[in-house]
């Protein structure tokens, strides 16, 4: 089961930018109560609790994306959006999956599948037993459809790829 879908900002590694990761959109499917208190909280407190959980996932995705880009040998200039006539390729975009232990930040263990495109992070929070191949294809399809709808993948409007392309000399 998918527990959440989120879109958030990604920053390039090695930049002086001290801005925080921002969640641009999130949708949580199902409710999870605060782990320390079985009694019912107000709707506002539950909303803030879910917001904190989603922000924790977004920060971990951003951290892993930056780590993957640095490990690939990308410099900060390689990760800046470039003006280009080439369409953005979703197959070259950084992606991955990681496991969240119970209590960090959800009560149950979860798997997070993520994709980084054009300084945006897309993530699905899943049950640990979900089919990751199917979930990855679904996430790529969602990202492509959203970016197509916003006209971010077309060469005329695109600000370029915000992910590292391997240098031939490396």
From Swiss-Prot:
User: Where mainly found?
Assistant: cytoplasm
Give the keywords, sorted: Cytoplasm, DNA damage, DNA repair, Endosome, Lysosome, Membrane, Protein transport, Transport
Keyword Protein transport in the entry? The reply is yes
**Which compartments does it reside in?**
Cytoplasm, Cytosol; Late endosome membrane; Lysosome membrane
Q: Which GO terms describe its cellular component?
A: AP-5 adaptor complex; AP-type membrane coat adaptor complex; cytosol; late endosome; late endosome membrane; lysosomal membrane; lysosome
PANTHER family from the xrefs? AP-5 COMPLEX SUBUNIT SIGMA-1 (PTHR16120:SF0)
Question: What name has this protein been given in UniProt?
Answer: AP-5 complex subunit sigma-1
Q: Which organism is it from?
A: Mus musculus
Name the gene.
Answer: Ap5s1
């Amino acid at each position: 089961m998918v527990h959440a879908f989120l879109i958030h900002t990604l920053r390039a590694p090695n930049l002086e930018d001290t801005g925080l990761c921002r969640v641009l959109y999130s949708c949580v499917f199902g409710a999870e109560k605060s782990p320390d208190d079985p009694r019912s909280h107000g709707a506002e407190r539950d909303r803030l609790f879910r917001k904190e959980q989603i922000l924790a996932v977004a920060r971990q995705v951003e951290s892993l994306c930056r780590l993957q880009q640095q490990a690939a040998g990308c410099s900060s200039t390689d990760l800046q959006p470039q003006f280009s006539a080439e369409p953005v390729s979703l197959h070259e975009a950084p992606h991955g999956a990681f496991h969240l232990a119970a209590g960090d930040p959800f009560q149950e263990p979860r798997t997070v599948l993520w994709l980084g495109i054009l300084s945006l992070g897309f993530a699905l929070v899943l049950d640990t037993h979900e089919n990751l191949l199917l979930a990855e294809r679904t996430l790529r399809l969602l990202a492509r459809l959203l970016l197509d709808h916003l006209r971010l993948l077309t060469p005329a409007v695109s600000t370029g790829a915000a992910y590292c392309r391997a240098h031939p000399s490396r």
